[in-house]
A protein has these predicted regions:
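Extended amphipathic alpha-helical segments enriched in small hydrophobics
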Residues: 248-277
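Acidic, turn-prone loop/beta-hairpin segments
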Residues: 280
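Conserved beta strand-loop-helix elements of the APE1-like EEP
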Residues: 1
Length: 280
């Protein structure tokens, strides 16, 4: 047993307060090069925001058929226009792919508390929400017995019954160029989106003061090399899945903007590049 341990052992140096990870010599070399060359994502003048938590998706996230029904129930052109502006397309984590997304024709009734909407100005939306029962939509945390069935309201907040659970103060960011990525993923998938698109709480998105850098970030973050590196930082779920915690994502080292291959930018040797290329 002792001979086996000596033959299979790997020397690792744990010199920082970061999480410990056991790597082979070639993996240690690759990790050091990435960290010595790249600038942590947090220093690229970017912002990471979390997707929207409604507290009751059945009421607030609707398909195109229901959206059209709500719009058809509007009593005036003015109400229809205002309502169409309130209902926005939304992505889920499962919709995010590498360099793109598959929109599932879902829409969000975006009654963010920070927007201070008057629900009386949206009668068709109000009627739709009330069809689920006001007690169910209240944000009181209370329990009710209705027709012999226990109904639990959404968790207690200071928000109104028709509003989403989270306040969401970054409404304008959904209208900017952004990078979407899922909260839990089998492999790192980032996609740039320049259209108006919202996302739910299984998704994060990145905005940048200079939107031009988003394409560079998308290119880097979608590589096998960065996928491998991220797994040395984050906690793995099951065999392959990882959680995209911002504390780790913000520390991914990104090289300067260039058209050169990423392995070249990080200064990887030929054998190190082959090692990454041969990963499953």
């Amino acid at each position: 047993m002792s001979d086996f341990v000596q033959q299979q052992s790997v020397e690792c140096r744990f010199e920082s307060s970061d999480s410990w990870v056991i790597l082979s010599p070639i993996e240690q070399s690759i990790k050091r090069k990435i960290e010595s060359v790249g600038t942590p994502l947090k220093d690229w003048d970017i912002q990471i925001n979390y997707g929207i938590k409604t507290g009751f998706n059945d009421a607030f996230i609707i398909n195109t058929e229901k959206r059209n029904e709500i719009l058809d129930n509007c009593c005036s052109d003015e109400e229809r226009t205002k309502t169409a502006e309130l209902i926005r397309p939304i992505l889920r984590g499962r919709d995010i792919k590498r360099y793109g997304y598959n929109w599932a024709d879902l829409w969000l009734i975006a009654t963010f508390p920070s927007r201070h909407y008057d629900i009386e100005m949206y009668p068709a939306v109000k009627a739709h929400l009330l069809s689920f029962g006001k007690e169910r939509l209240e944000q009181t945390g209370k329990k009710y017995i209705i027709n012999g069935e226990e109904i639990k309201a959404r968790k207690k907040t200071s928000n109104k019954w028709f509003e989403t659970q989270d306040s969401i103060s970054y409404w304008d960011d959904f209208f900017k160029p952004k990078l979407f990525y899922a909260d839990i993923t089998q492999k790192l998938n980032f996609c740039r989106c320049d259209e108006v698109m919202f996302c739910n709480n299984t998704t994060y998105f990145i905005t940048a003061k200079n939107p031009n850098i988003l394409t560079h970030l998308e290119r880097c973050l979608n590589t096998k090399l960065i996928d491998w590196y991220y797994r040395t930082l984050s906690v793995q779920l099951g065999e392959n899945a990882v959680r995209m915690f911002s504390i780790y994502v913000l520390n991914i080292p990104i090289p300067n903007i260039s058209d050169m291959p990423l392995a070249t930018l990080y200064g990887l040797s030929e054998s190190e590049s082959r090692y990454i290329d041969n990963l499953p």
